């Protein structure tokens, strides 16, 4: 079956967001990333600002804090409500049109569909650090901290909500090293696979 949905999970600083955006442009299909925050907020009943800060990165304080977090009458934590709203939005987008979806555990959420290409973009630390320095105008030490912290939070979120291991090749159709292949080649490989 032809793939009509492309999910891109990525390490921070690997250029996965840029690669996904370029693939969507070249294919003439929709691109979803932070632009789905308002939809998630509406479905969860939370503010867009809260969702923006927490959607992909929660449960940020670890399992102990999660166990004692505030819950609604159904027993769901705020993080669970955000995740459930995110899941619904991603399922709706996949039904609506061909698209590229960045992050948000979309590969797992859409795992039962045959028309999805799941991609994981990673890179070599030195190149990722230099990209973070350029994009965020930070010192090297801050770039390293950002890379480690954000990837750790993505991993915790993914592992918690999917019961799978973030970045493990078995969970994706393609795993591409953007440092070794370059962005253009990553884009071409993805487009060749759909």
Where do the PLM segments sit?
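Pre-Walker A (Motif I) flank of P-loop NTPase domains
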Residues: 2-11, 97
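Small-molecule kinase domains that catalyze NTP-dependent phosphoryl transfer to phosphate-bearing small molecules
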Residues: 59-66, 139-184
